[in-house]
A protein has these predicted regions:
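Short S/T/G/P-rich N-terminal loop/turn motif that feeds into the first structured element of a domain
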Residues: 1-50, 60-68, 79-116
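Short arginine-rich
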Residues: 73-79
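Conserved RNP beta-strands of RNA recognition motif
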Residues: 53-57
Length: 116
């Protein structure tokens, strides 16, 4: 089963680094708690084209369980603008932190094997 990436974007102005870090660290505990619900990773976005997050889930089902219409309504209320959600299946991942390549979440090659 492929992992799922959801890109969430808000049409909002770029924040200062200080505000972006403050916002991210204040909500990080919520997302750390989602590890048991399939969230592998969340990266917070801050740029000229808006703000948001990139979520890597263990499956589309896990992502859909989190990103319900109720959740989108909650985010809309919090940020004052409705987010755009873009969904992707990801079949192949190169993870340089772990030194491996994964297919559908399963390691198929370690960095030492690739270098040989």
């Amino acid at each position: 089963m492929p992992n799922c990436i959801v890109v969430v974007q808000f049409d909002l102005p770029k924040r200062s680094e200080e505000l972006a870090v403050k916002g991210g660290t204040s909500t990080a505990p919520t997302y750390r708690g989602l590890a048991t619900k399939g969230l592998i990773r969340k990266d917070y976005l801050n740029g000229e084209s808006g703000t948001g997050g990139v979520y890597l889930w263990d499956s589309r089902e896990s992502a859909q369980a989190w990103f319900t219409e109720e959740r989108v309504a909650e985010l809309t209320k919090r940020f004052g603008v409705r987010p755009r959600l873009t969904w992707y299946d990801t079949h192949v991942t190169v993870d340089n932190l772990k030194g491996e390549t994964r297919v559908n979440g399963k390691a198929i090659e370690k960095a030492t094997e690739a270098a040989a």
